[in-house]
Protein backbone atom coordinates (compact mmCIF):
# COMPACT_ATOMS: atom_id res chain seq x y z
CA UNK A 1 0.00 0.00 0.00
CA UNK A 2 1.13 3.56 -0.72
CA UNK A 3 0.72 6.52 1.58
CA UNK A 4 -1.37 9.28 -0.02
CA UNK A 5 1.50 11.76 0.13
CA UNK A 6 3.92 9.50 -1.79
CA UNK A 7 4.07 10.90 -5.30
CA UNK A 8 5.12 8.36 -7.98
CA UNK A 9 6.14 11.24 -10.27
CA UNK A 10 8.81 13.91 -9.97
CA UNK A 11 8.01 17.59 -10.46
CA UNK A 12 9.12 17.39 -14.10
CA UNK A 13 6.71 14.50 -14.76
CA UNK A 14 9.34 11.75 -14.81
CA UNK A 15 8.87 8.60 -12.76
CA UNK A 16 10.39 8.76 -9.28
CA UNK A 17 13.04 6.09 -8.81
CA UNK A 18 15.13 4.64 -6.01
CA UNK A 19 18.09 4.80 -8.41
CA UNK A 20 18.37 8.57 -8.07
CA UNK A 21 16.76 8.80 -4.61
CA UNK A 22 13.75 10.67 -6.02
CA UNK A 23 11.41 8.03 -4.61
CA UNK A 24 10.75 8.75 -0.92
CA UNK A 25 8.42 5.84 -0.17
CA UNK A 26 9.31 2.40 1.11
CA UNK A 27 10.36 -0.48 -1.17
CA UNK A 28 9.99 0.49 -4.84
CA UNK A 29 7.79 2.85 -6.78
CA UNK A 30 5.27 0.52 -8.48
CA UNK A 31 5.51 2.49 -11.72
CA UNK A 32 9.29 2.29 -11.63
CA UNK A 33 9.09 -1.44 -10.96
CA UNK A 34 6.77 -1.98 -13.94
CA UNK A 35 9.07 0.04 -16.20
CA UNK A 36 12.07 -2.08 -15.23
CA UNK A 37 10.23 -5.42 -15.27
CA UNK A 38 8.19 -5.28 -18.48
CA UNK A 39 5.98 -8.16 -19.62
CA UNK A 40 4.48 -8.48 -23.10
CA UNK A 41 1.78 -10.94 -24.14
CA UNK A 42 0.52 -12.04 -27.53
CA UNK A 43 -2.47 -14.23 -28.26
CA UNK A 44 -3.81 -15.49 -31.58
CA UNK A 45 -7.13 -17.31 -31.63
CA UNK A 46 -9.09 -19.02 -34.40
CA UNK A 47 -12.68 -20.23 -34.03
CA UNK A 48 -14.28 -22.12 -36.89
CA UNK A 49 -17.53 -24.02 -37.36
CA UNK A 50 -18.69 -26.16 -40.26
CA UNK A 51 -22.07 -27.85 -40.41
CA UNK A 52 -24.44 -29.65 -42.75
CA UNK A 53 -28.19 -29.92 -42.29
CA UNK A 54 -30.79 -31.90 -44.21
CA UNK A 55 -34.56 -32.38 -43.97
CA UNK A 56 -35.30 -35.78 -45.55
CA UNK A 57 -38.98 -35.69 -44.53
CA UNK A 58 -41.33 -33.13 -43.06
CA UNK A 59 -40.48 -32.38 -39.44
CA UNK A 60 -37.16 -34.27 -39.42
CA UNK A 61 -33.90 -32.32 -39.24
CA UNK A 62 -30.55 -34.11 -39.31
CA UNK A 63 -27.54 -31.96 -38.51
CA UNK A 64 -23.81 -32.62 -38.26
CA UNK A 65 -21.47 -29.93 -36.95
CA UNK A 66 -17.70 -29.72 -36.61
CA UNK A 67 -16.01 -26.98 -34.55
CA UNK A 68 -12.35 -26.14 -33.98
CA UNK A 69 -10.94 -23.76 -31.37
CA UNK A 70 -7.21 -22.98 -31.65
CA UNK A 71 -5.17 -20.54 -29.56
CA UNK A 72 -1.46 -19.65 -29.61
CA UNK A 73 -0.12 -17.57 -26.70
CA UNK A 74 3.35 -16.22 -25.96
CA UNK A 75 4.84 -14.14 -23.16
CA UNK A 76 8.17 -12.33 -22.82
CA UNK A 77 9.33 -11.14 -19.40
CA UNK A 78 12.35 -8.98 -18.59
CA UNK A 79 13.95 -7.65 -15.43
CA UNK A 80 16.68 -5.12 -16.19
CA UNK A 81 20.04 -5.40 -14.39
CA UNK A 82 20.15 -1.65 -13.75
CA UNK A 83 17.10 -1.86 -11.50
CA UNK A 84 18.22 -1.27 -7.93
CA UNK A 85 16.96 -4.53 -6.44
CA UNK A 86 18.60 -6.67 -9.14
CA UNK A 87 22.16 -5.81 -8.08
CA UNK A 88 23.42 -5.67 -11.66
CA UNK A 89 22.05 -9.10 -12.68
CA UNK A 90 19.07 -9.20 -15.04
CA UNK A 91 16.53 -11.87 -15.89
CA UNK A 92 14.63 -12.78 -19.05
CA UNK A 93 11.99 -15.42 -19.66
CA UNK A 94 9.84 -16.67 -22.49
CA UNK A 95 6.84 -18.98 -22.56
CA UNK A 96 4.65 -20.37 -25.31
CA UNK A 97 1.43 -22.35 -25.32
CA UNK A 98 -0.71 -23.97 -28.03
CA UNK A 99 -4.23 -25.23 -27.41
CA UNK A 100 -6.57 -27.03 -29.80
CA UNK A 101 -10.09 -28.26 -29.09
CA UNK A 102 -12.11 -30.24 -31.65
CA UNK A 103 -15.83 -30.89 -31.24
CA UNK A 104 -18.16 -32.93 -33.44
CA UNK A 105 -21.91 -32.98 -32.81
CA UNK A 106 -24.55 -35.05 -34.60
CA UNK A 107 -28.28 -34.65 -33.94
CA UNK A 108 -31.59 -35.84 -35.34
CA UNK A 109 -34.66 -33.81 -34.38
CA UNK A 110 -38.20 -34.93 -35.27
CA UNK A 111 -41.24 -32.72 -34.63
CA UNK A 112 -44.84 -33.51 -35.55
CA UNK A 113 -48.44 -32.84 -34.51
CA UNK A 114 -51.41 -35.23 -34.42
CA UNK A 115 -55.03 -34.10 -34.61
CA UNK A 116 -53.94 -30.49 -34.11
CA UNK A 117 -53.66 -30.84 -30.31
CA UNK A 118 -50.98 -33.49 -29.71
CA UNK A 119 -47.48 -32.09 -30.31
CA UNK A 120 -44.31 -34.20 -30.15
CA UNK A 121 -40.63 -33.30 -30.29
CA UNK A 122 -37.89 -35.94 -30.17
CA UNK A 123 -34.13 -35.44 -30.26
CA UNK A 124 -31.28 -37.95 -30.49
CA UNK A 125 -27.67 -36.84 -30.46
CA UNK A 126 -24.01 -37.59 -30.04
CA UNK A 127 -21.09 -35.31 -29.21
CA UNK A 128 -17.36 -35.87 -28.97
CA UNK A 129 -14.68 -33.48 -27.71
CA UNK A 130 -10.92 -33.87 -28.02
CA UNK A 131 -8.61 -31.22 -26.55
CA UNK A 132 -4.84 -30.93 -26.57
CA UNK A 133 -2.48 -28.39 -25.03
CA UNK A 134 1.28 -28.10 -24.86
CA UNK A 135 3.72 -25.39 -23.91
CA UNK A 136 7.10 -24.54 -22.45
CA UNK A 137 8.76 -21.83 -20.41
CA UNK A 138 12.37 -20.91 -19.77
CA UNK A 139 14.03 -18.18 -17.75
CA UNK A 140 17.70 -17.13 -17.81
CA UNK A 141 19.48 -14.78 -15.41
CA UNK A 142 22.85 -13.06 -15.27
CA UNK A 143 22.41 -10.42 -18.01
CA UNK A 144 24.51 -7.31 -17.32
CA UNK A 145 23.12 -4.85 -19.87
CA UNK A 146 19.57 -3.48 -20.12
CA UNK A 147 19.75 -3.55 -23.92
CA UNK A 148 20.85 -7.19 -23.91
CA UNK A 149 18.34 -8.57 -21.43
CA UNK A 150 17.37 -11.59 -23.53
CA UNK A 151 17.40 -15.36 -23.10
CA UNK A 152 20.61 -15.83 -25.10
CA UNK A 153 22.54 -13.31 -22.99
CA UNK A 154 21.89 -15.03 -19.68
CA UNK A 155 24.58 -17.03 -17.94
CA UNK A 156 22.48 -19.28 -15.68
CA UNK A 157 19.13 -21.01 -16.08
CA UNK A 158 16.72 -19.60 -13.52
CA UNK A 159 13.85 -21.97 -14.35
CA UNK A 160 12.66 -24.23 -17.13
CA UNK A 161 9.63 -26.35 -17.82
CA UNK A 162 8.18 -28.21 -20.78
CA UNK A 163 4.80 -28.27 -19.04
CA UNK A 164 4.61 -24.49 -18.50
CA UNK A 165 2.20 -23.92 -15.62
CA UNK A 166 0.18 -27.04 -16.33
CA UNK A 167 -0.22 -26.39 -20.05
CA UNK A 168 0.68 -29.93 -21.16
CA UNK A 169 -2.50 -31.99 -21.15
CA UNK A 170 -5.03 -33.83 -23.27
CA UNK A 171 -8.57 -34.92 -22.54
CA UNK A 172 -11.63 -36.30 -24.31
CA UNK A 173 -15.39 -36.43 -23.81
CA UNK A 174 -17.96 -38.62 -25.51
CA UNK A 175 -21.70 -38.16 -25.02
CA UNK A 176 -24.91 -39.78 -26.26
CA UNK A 177 -28.21 -38.13 -25.40
CA UNK A 178 -31.91 -38.14 -26.11
CA UNK A 179 -34.88 -35.93 -25.27
CA UNK A 180 -38.62 -36.23 -25.74
CA UNK A 181 -41.33 -33.58 -25.34
CA UNK A 182 -45.10 -33.81 -25.54
CA UNK A 183 -47.79 -31.21 -25.03
CA UNK A 184 -51.52 -31.42 -25.32
CA UNK A 185 -53.21 -28.33 -26.69
CA UNK A 186 -50.71 -26.04 -24.97
CA UNK A 187 -52.10 -27.08 -21.59
CA UNK A 188 -50.26 -30.17 -20.40
CA UNK A 189 -46.56 -30.72 -20.98
CA UNK A 190 -44.33 -33.72 -20.38
CA UNK A 191 -40.62 -33.93 -21.16
CA UNK A 192 -37.88 -36.41 -20.40
CA UNK A 193 -34.19 -36.70 -21.17
CA UNK A 194 -31.53 -39.36 -20.88
CA UNK A 195 -27.82 -39.07 -21.51
CA UNK A 196 -24.62 -40.98 -20.93
CA UNK A 197 -21.21 -39.32 -20.85
CA UNK A 198 -17.62 -40.56 -20.74
CA UNK A 199 -14.66 -38.49 -19.55
CA UNK A 200 -10.96 -39.27 -19.81
CA UNK A 201 -10.48 -37.54 -16.44
CA UNK A 202 -11.54 -40.77 -14.72
CA UNK A 203 -10.04 -44.25 -14.69
CA UNK A 204 -11.05 -46.71 -17.40
CA UNK A 205 -13.56 -48.47 -15.10
CA UNK A 206 -15.31 -45.25 -14.04
CA UNK A 207 -15.40 -43.08 -17.14
CA UNK A 208 -19.09 -43.49 -17.98
CA UNK A 209 -21.95 -41.80 -16.16
CA UNK A 210 -25.71 -41.94 -16.89
CA UNK A 211 -28.09 -39.07 -16.11
CA UNK A 212 -31.80 -38.49 -16.59
CA UNK A 213 -34.59 -35.99 -15.97
CA UNK A 214 -38.41 -35.85 -16.12
CA UNK A 215 -40.57 -32.74 -16.12
CA UNK A 216 -44.29 -31.93 -16.00
CA UNK A 217 -46.02 -28.60 -16.55
CA UNK A 218 -49.63 -27.50 -16.35
CA UNK A 219 -50.66 -24.29 -18.07
CA UNK A 220 -53.64 -23.40 -15.90
CA UNK A 221 -54.40 -20.26 -17.87
CA UNK A 222 -55.67 -22.51 -20.65
CA UNK A 223 -58.32 -23.99 -18.35
CA UNK A 224 -61.88 -22.70 -18.51
CA UNK A 225 -62.04 -21.84 -14.82
CA UNK A 226 -59.39 -19.14 -15.31
CA UNK A 227 -60.59 -17.71 -18.60
CA UNK A 228 -62.50 -14.92 -16.88
CA UNK A 229 -59.50 -13.75 -14.84
CA UNK A 230 -58.31 -11.06 -17.23
CA UNK A 231 -55.90 -9.63 -14.67
CA UNK A 232 -54.14 -13.00 -14.34
CA UNK A 233 -52.29 -13.36 -17.64
CA UNK A 234 -49.93 -16.26 -16.81
CA UNK A 235 -50.42 -19.27 -14.55
CA UNK A 236 -48.09 -22.26 -14.90
CA UNK A 237 -47.30 -25.02 -12.42
CA UNK A 238 -44.18 -27.12 -13.07
CA UNK A 239 -42.54 -30.11 -11.43
CA UNK A 240 -39.20 -31.61 -12.46
CA UNK A 241 -36.72 -34.11 -11.09
CA UNK A 242 -33.50 -35.53 -12.42
CA UNK A 243 -29.78 -36.06 -12.10
CA UNK A 244 -26.74 -34.24 -13.47
CA UNK A 245 -23.02 -34.94 -13.46
CA UNK A 246 -19.81 -33.01 -12.83
CA UNK A 247 -16.37 -34.06 -14.07
CA UNK A 248 -14.50 -30.84 -13.27
CA UNK A 249 -11.39 -32.31 -11.66
CA UNK A 250 -7.73 -32.40 -12.70
CA UNK A 251 -6.97 -33.93 -16.08
CA UNK A 252 -4.98 -36.76 -14.49
CA UNK A 253 -6.31 -36.77 -10.93
CA UNK A 254 -6.91 -40.53 -11.03
CA UNK A 255 -3.26 -41.31 -11.87
CA UNK A 256 -0.15 -41.45 -9.70
CA UNK A 257 2.33 -38.97 -11.15
CA UNK A 258 5.96 -37.94 -10.89
CA UNK A 259 7.32 -34.54 -11.82
CA UNK A 260 10.63 -33.32 -13.19
CA UNK A 261 12.43 -30.04 -12.66
CA UNK A 262 14.25 -31.01 -9.47
CA UNK A 263 18.01 -30.91 -9.19
CA UNK A 264 20.48 -32.27 -6.66
CA UNK A 265 24.15 -31.33 -6.75
CA UNK A 266 23.70 -30.05 -10.30
CA UNK A 267 21.95 -33.22 -11.52
CA UNK A 268 18.35 -33.26 -12.77
CA UNK A 269 15.79 -35.46 -11.07
CA UNK A 270 12.15 -36.30 -10.54
CA UNK A 271 9.95 -36.57 -7.47
CA UNK A 272 6.49 -37.98 -6.58
CA UNK A 273 3.94 -35.27 -7.34
CA UNK A 274 0.56 -36.94 -6.88
CA UNK A 275 -0.96 -40.05 -5.39
CA UNK A 276 -3.64 -41.27 -7.79
CA UNK A 277 -7.10 -42.65 -7.09
CA UNK A 278 -8.44 -44.94 -9.85
CA UNK A 279 -11.85 -45.03 -8.12
CA UNK A 280 -12.60 -41.37 -8.85
CA UNK A 281 -15.88 -41.02 -10.73
CA UNK A 282 -18.61 -38.57 -11.66
CA UNK A 283 -20.05 -36.28 -9.02
CA UNK A 284 -23.81 -36.81 -9.27
CA UNK A 285 -26.49 -34.36 -8.14
CA UNK A 286 -30.20 -35.17 -7.87
CA UNK A 287 -32.45 -32.11 -8.03
CA UNK A 288 -36.23 -31.91 -7.58
CA UNK A 289 -37.95 -28.61 -8.33
CA UNK A 290 -41.54 -27.37 -7.88
CA UNK A 291 -42.32 -23.99 -9.45
CA UNK A 292 -45.30 -21.66 -9.81
CA UNK A 293 -45.12 -18.93 -12.47
CA UNK A 294 -47.65 -16.09 -12.31
CA UNK A 295 -48.16 -13.02 -14.49
CA UNK A 296 -50.42 -10.07 -13.76
CA UNK A 297 -51.78 -7.62 -16.35
CA UNK A 298 -48.90 -8.52 -18.69
CA UNK A 299 -46.71 -6.29 -16.54
CA UNK A 300 -45.80 -8.04 -13.32
CA UNK A 301 -44.28 -11.53 -13.05
CA UNK A 302 -43.94 -13.65 -9.94
CA UNK A 303 -41.94 -16.90 -9.76
CA UNK A 304 -42.06 -19.10 -6.68
CA UNK A 305 -39.80 -22.17 -6.55
CA UNK A 306 -39.11 -24.91 -4.05
CA UNK A 307 -36.25 -27.30 -4.69
CA UNK A 308 -34.28 -30.07 -3.09
CA UNK A 309 -30.74 -30.82 -4.23
CA UNK A 310 -28.59 -33.68 -3.01
Where in the sequence are the language-model features?
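Surface-exposed loop/interface segments of Gram-negative outer-membrane beta-barrel transport/assembly proteins
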Residues: 1-45, 65-174, 220-287, 293, ...
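Structured alpha-helical segments in the cores of large, soluble enzyme domains
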Residues: 174-184
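Transmembrane beta-barrel architecture of outer membranes
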Residues: 175, 209-211
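Transmembrane beta-strand segments that form the barrel wall of outer-membrane beta-barrel proteins
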Residues: 190-199, 239-241
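Solvent-exposed loop/turn segments connecting transmembrane beta-strands
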Residues: 200-206
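Outer-membrane beta-barrel "beta-signal"
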Residues: 214-217
Amino acid sequence: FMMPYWNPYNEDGSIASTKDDSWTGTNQNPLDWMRNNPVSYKKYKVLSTLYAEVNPIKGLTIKSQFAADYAHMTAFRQSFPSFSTNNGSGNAGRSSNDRLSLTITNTANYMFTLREKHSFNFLLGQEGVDAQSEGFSISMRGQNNDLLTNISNGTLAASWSDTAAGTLYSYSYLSFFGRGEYNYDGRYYVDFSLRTDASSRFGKDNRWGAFWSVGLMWNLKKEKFLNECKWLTTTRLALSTGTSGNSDIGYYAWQSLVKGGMDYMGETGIYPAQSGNPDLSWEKTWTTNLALHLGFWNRINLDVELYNKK
